[in-house]
Amino acid sequence: MAKQSKPGKAKNIINIFLPGGSAHQESWDPKYLSPAEYRGPLGTVKTNTGERFSENLKNTAKVADKITVIRSMTHGEAAHERGTHNMMTGIRPSPAVIFPSIGSIVSHEFGPRKNLPPYVAIPSQSRNGGTGYLGSAYGAFSLGADPGNSNFRVRDLALPSGIDAKRFG
């Protein structure tokens, strides 16, 4: 068991949500003490806090004291879509009200960030995210494309035609 730490002073949050991504046994929760049929085919690496991550996360294990891994998240929904909505908003889905996502809630609570977007969604806002009743001031800046593509450009950040970098700078 990892030792207890002091309350955090974090000013930023990186929420990694991988719908259809790697299984928890092959990433953050390898279940290394379980029988082979439950723990998966990969080995583990000990983190700098004493926990274990998959061997695929060796570099992340070195900075585990700087992150929070939530292994106890559950919901009572039968469908993945409804469960995802519940996890990303904290509320069960309702046709009557569109609730804000975690990014919008955090940006609302932290307030403005010196002309920076409230939060960034890569590559785009999920179906279960959005500002809900908080309004567009708390919405994500969506890249709108996959940064892994060779021709990737962040939309709306190009200079207007006829303006070159020399004139702009």
Predicted regions and their residues:
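Ligand-binding pockets and gating/stacking loops
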Residues: 1-169
